[in-house]
Regions:
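Extended beta-strand/beta-hairpin segments
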Residues: 2-87, 94-171
Length: 171
């Protein structure tokens, strides 16, 4: 198994575009999109980590009750943002790995791949507040070059490694 670590903290620089603020990783050119192949919307309301999230887009709209994890003083009676991030990252990484296996003629090499992600939430060193660290374990694939190619093609990995444009505005 190859471990690939990704780390994200809030080392952002800001530039103002009209009434919207765009954030990107300091010192790096963020990944910019030349088009939008798919867009999804989500809404969070209530008490933040103890509130509700919903997405009404796509074929299967859904909503979840959020709860503070026991490790952070909560009751752990619901889903938390880190779980959602870990699941999204794992599935996205698997898709990117399988896509790259197909593009490089190694489809069979990723046929039995299983992606395990661990998301750590902790105090961001030197920044205050919280930051994230991610551990990715790739099971069932021996080809390290293929794993690297999957990591480089994964949109989640790209956002964490290179930054993403994040526009924040008043509704």
């Amino acid at each position: 198994m190859l471990n690939i670590g990704a780390r994200i903290v809030n080392t952002s620089r800001m530039r103002t575009i009209q009434a919207t603020r765009s954030y990107a990783t300091k010192g790096a050119a963020p990944v910019t999109l030349k088009n939008h192949k798919y867009t999804v919307h989500a809404t969070a309301a209530g008490q933040g980590r103890k509130g509700e999230v919903k997405s009404l887009d796509g074929d299967t709209p859904f909503s979840l009750h959020l709860a503070m994890p026991k490790a952070m003083g909560g009751k752990g009676e619901g889903t938390n943002p880190e779980q959602l991030f870990a699941m999204g990252y794992a599935s996205c990484f698997l898709g990117a790995l399988q896509m790259m296996a197909g593009k490089t003629g190694k489809k069979d090499a990723a046929r039995n791949a299983v992606i395990h992600t661990t998301v750590h939430l902790g105090e961001a060193e030197g920044l205050g507040g919280f930051g994230l660290a991610v551990d990715i374990k790739v099971e069932g694939v021996e080809d390290e070059e293929l794993i690297k190619a999957g990591h480089e093609a994964c949109p989640y990995s790209r956002a964490l490694m290179h930054g993403a444009v994040v526009n924040v505005s008043k509704a």
